[in-house]
């Protein structure tokens, strides 16, 4: 009988192996190799790690069940995609070839994840042979490309490499659950919002924090979040006496730290929390939004800036930003929520 391994653990094992390869194998073995031999070794290790990722995900079948009715019922609840194929987009930076190259982690359910087939409309990951990406971000990317008749290419990237990739023009856009912060928008332009998020915490049902009604009730707790996020950089520090651990490299790693008892609670956004709870009924969401006990920002405008999610494009690429915004403008917050509910319904099972 096969043993089900949580997807968070599978990705943790992959990233651990990746770090080991870079820091141990290269350090101790590469010294005796010349440059050509080192390049060959790097390619072999990269291939091996990709195969390890595929094997780690092999047992992770996408959930083919939905919240009820036909699998495509949700499409009747959102606007049809406007036909914009007559629009000349050949002069848009990066779109000269008609291909929109989109970066995402492919490890951040329900926004994006990796699966082993094209079920539920998944799209091949160009730099991970045999693997496919799906999730809310993929759904949004497909709507944009369908509107203009563009071909969609999805590239898997580490979180911290997403913005530099857009700046270097190796990606045309990032659709990856990125907040529209002032710091990020100083580096790239952002279309959107393409999702209106809420900041929440997640803990276990048997935790002493399970009945927390405000961030004050989380005082003294051990916690973490994902690196490079507003949740880690600005929210957790508002909890009095909190023991803040090093940030997790990925969302699955963050969730696994909670599941294994390394932390008392994590801070994330509502979709990530909902996705985690859907796969692990021992987790519970702590939502303080709309109360005096919520995380604080200088103004509601600043809250929106730090919570709402946008699509990164090259600084100054107004044509691409405007093209994406035209597609997004046809949808409301309710429509985005319907799409997100569908993504949660089909995300990989444990």
Predicted regions span which residues?
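Extracytoplasmic small-molecule ligand-binding "clamshell" domains
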Residues: 67-178
